[in-house]
């Protein structure tokens, strides 16, 4: 078995730069950035460190082979060539999942069956047995076929890394934790930041911002698939957990305030903050956005209700308009609003300094970024429909 592995960390589009910084910070080597994924190198300790510490990626996978596969024979041979006996014990359970895109082999179930057969044959030959009970630890095998090139991977994470362990329940259409962590990074949240959210929902944006400010590792409250893998010793997990705990900075000046008109959401946000260990830094209250007055030094991170969280588009537009009016009267250090509403700037009443295309799960969104802008006259002028090309023609009058 090699001393170092090639690892893959998929992430949502728009999160790659933040994820690269995180990987550099934990000592990953040979980091390469692609669309929606990063590859890097590291030993067994890196598998533990990456799963425990990465905030913005979806999972960590061990890349076992990359090879051309236009036929089932080629698919089988590429899988059989992997030294599975060094990774999987004789009693391992090994489900196979994957996808195929723009490839000759289009049937995912058929590919799953071929890959499973190849692993079974290799393990039987190398373990000198005719029986594989699959009663032991689960090793999830994943494959990806793209343009007749196959990647075979072993999942080290289990449930996605957005499952932090603190959000037991959520309101409708919550923001994904990994995306919230990326927004906190783009918003330049620091140890002494003051952060506010007028549409806090179940509190995810502020909780992720607090954990970032306090350097609380996101994976401390959960378990990972690779904790049962024989080639990642339990001692490494214990060491990495202890290291993460030691690097936490609980005594910081960070403070966050979240508001929502729904008392149930506020109660849930408070419960989630307590589970996340940031209840002393995050404060949630019932309040209407019409009463929101951002503090001058505040960074506002928010996910305005839209789509599943609103019954009508008109209702969402009205809330965005109200937010714009309140922000015009109470300017702050910056506003970072993530929404699927492509007309947000028109409703809000001001063009963003910068926009970034992102995804909340499978929902395409835009992050609208406003930095230290002067007061402006709020007039919700109509704007032309626009895609992601960044072209805009409407100007808003400034005072």
How does the language model describe each region?
Residues 45-52, 159-162, 376-378:
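Short, charged/polar, Gly/Pro-enriched secondary-structure boundary elements
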Residues 152-186:
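SAM-dependent Rossmann-like transferase core, predominantly class I methyltransferases
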Residues 175-293, 308-309, 313-317:
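Conserved S-adenosyl-L-methionine
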